[in-house]
From Swiss-Prot:
This is tRNA dimethylallyltransferase. One of its GO terms (biological process) is tRNA modification. The lineage of its organism: Bacteria, Pseudomonadati, Campylobacterota, Epsilonproteobacteria, Campylobacterales. PANTHER family: TRNA DIMETHYLALLYLTRANSFERASE. It comes from Campylobacter concisus (strain 13826). It is an enzyme of class 2 (transferase). One of its GO terms (molecular function) is tRNA dimethylallyltransferase activity.
């Protein structure tokens, strides 16, 4: 039976392994939300599913493009539609999983068009006052300490010459998912740090440095994916800036910082969801799929 669900969690939370296990059990399809697994040749740094896993379960959102090719959220929408069509035809679950909550949020809420950045010649307080006068709908939702949203508001205001709240409603691409069961794996902070440290060591043992060396030699322009955690630190190591021990420590530290940002994003953006440890989350998903 076709059902779709999202399995989210921070990096190193075990969501990919659980998604694979469930997809095997229910003959399902997986859509990866991982913004790095999209790229061919970035295998270890992205903690991409192994080749035998990709053969055993149909994956979408993995090995879609090369690191120097352009990609957009709109393109991801199309990948989602293809994955959903295959799952519907097979009459099986579609399991959406990965660390890029931004993609999931866009699919649920719609996609605002890109707006060129402009020079910010006002303080947060001044932008907020401007929003309060011209766009109280927006100002009522955010504080004057929310730099990111205030800057986005000001960019739209300058670019469109219209009230941003109205402009966004008129120009946002509609959502592609109306309702979705969302399950989040949550770990104790210390346990997650230990998992991150272990995964970092495993990635280095599997050949992360060699992968990075290959990528930096092939892509001299250093496209954005090569600036990701794991690869940027390897570049420092390859250039003699840090030692092997410092490399492992830096990757683990930066990954833990990423996990904190992911947790904050998931908490603030996805209110209606089940949250539990790995075993609890697995149990709840099984109930959902069998129900």
């Amino acid at each position: 039976m076709f059902k779709e669900l999202a399995l989210i969690g921070t990096t190193a939370s075990g969501k990919s392994d659980l998604a694979f296990e469930l997809a095997k059990e229910f003959e399902g399809v997986i859509l990866s939300l991982d913004s790095l697994a999209l790229y061919k040749e970035i295998d270890i740094a992205s903690a991409k599913p192994k080749s035998w896993q990709l053969e055993a379960v149909r994956h979408f959102g993995v090995d879609e493009i090369y690191p120097d090719e352009e990609f957009s959220v709109g393109a991801f929408f199309e990948i989602y539609k293809n994955a959903k069509e295959i799952a519907r035809l097979r009459g099986c679950p579609l399991i959406i999983t990965g660390g890029s909550g931004f993609y999931l949020k866009a699919m649920l809420s719609g996609l605002a068009p890109d707006v060129p950045k402009c020079e910010l010649n006002l303080s947060n307080e001044e932008i907020y006052e401007l929003a309060l006068q011209n766009d109280p709908e927006f100002a009522g939702k955010f504080s004057q300490n929310d730099s990111y949203r205030l800057e986005k508001w000001y960019q739209i205001y300058k670019f469109s010459g219209q009230i941003p709240s109205i402009w966004l409603r008129e120009n946002t691409k509609p959502s592609v998912i109306k309702e979705l069961a969302i399950f989040e794996i949550l770990w104790d902070k210390d346990e997650l740090r230990a998992r991150i440290a272990k995964r970092t060591k495993n990635m280095l043992d599997e050949g992360l440095i060699d992968e990075a060396k290959f990528l930096f030699e092939k892509y001299k322009s250093e496209p954005k994916p090569l600036k990701s955690i794991g690869l940027k630190e390897c570049k420092q190591f390859l250039e003699g800036e840090i030692s092997k021990n410092e490399l492992e420590t830096l990757i683990a530290t930066h990954t833990a910082q990423l996990a904190k940002r992911q947790r904050t994003f998931n908490r603030s953006q996805f209110e209606k969801k089940f949250v539990g440890d790995l075993a609890q989350t697995r149990s709840e998903i099984l109930k959902f799929l069998k129900g």
